[in-house]
């Protein structure tokens, strides 16, 4: 009798462990991260007729490298590609289909400005817990950067990938004179991807729609101004 009770207890313990493990696995599966890759820029600083995201580095276009990194990442479940309306067919045939980017579920037209394209990408997200916003003309990302960004976003809801500045930075006044020299250890140069809890960045962008966004230079600016959430630097 004692042995049977002990065996039954052990059996129920094993079942509970399996159920708990299954619940944890399902919870992890439910958490989805979407990468919004922006490829609608004009690339005016580069000159020439070919947009910089379509220029080739080695054997592949610049855009290929970031899409490939997101495609291979276990932390990314879906990619939304935002490009110029005239380039949607090109991106589908010559980028997505040609290189087998199966995580790209939608190619959508961008807007006049970068923030318009970001907002279009956010509206295209259907099931998303975290969103990576990345400039497709920046090819040098890695799985380590993706993980760093996601870990940071899980801490506060917002994370900007960047590097501590190696250069001394001067703040100027409106007349072009040095106004202030911030301590170099407090200055970062930020990059993309920038990673956010989806509900946070969506709310911030919606709040900004009725305001002047010409001074917005990155997505973190929108979160800073509209939510007050502290943004983690990683």
PLM region spans:
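Short, Lys/Arg-enriched N-terminal segments with co-localized hydrophobic residues
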Residues: 16-29
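N-terminal glycine-rich phosphate-binding loop and ensuing alpha1 helix
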Residues: 31-88
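Residue-level signal for inorganic ion chemistry
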Residues: 37, 63, 121, 135, ...
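Conserved donor nucleotide-binding strand/loop of the catalytic core
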Residues: 99-112
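Active-site nucleotide-sugar/metal-binding loop of Leloir-type enzymes
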Residues: 119-130
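Conserved core of the sugar-phosphate nucleotidyltransferase
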Residues: 140-232
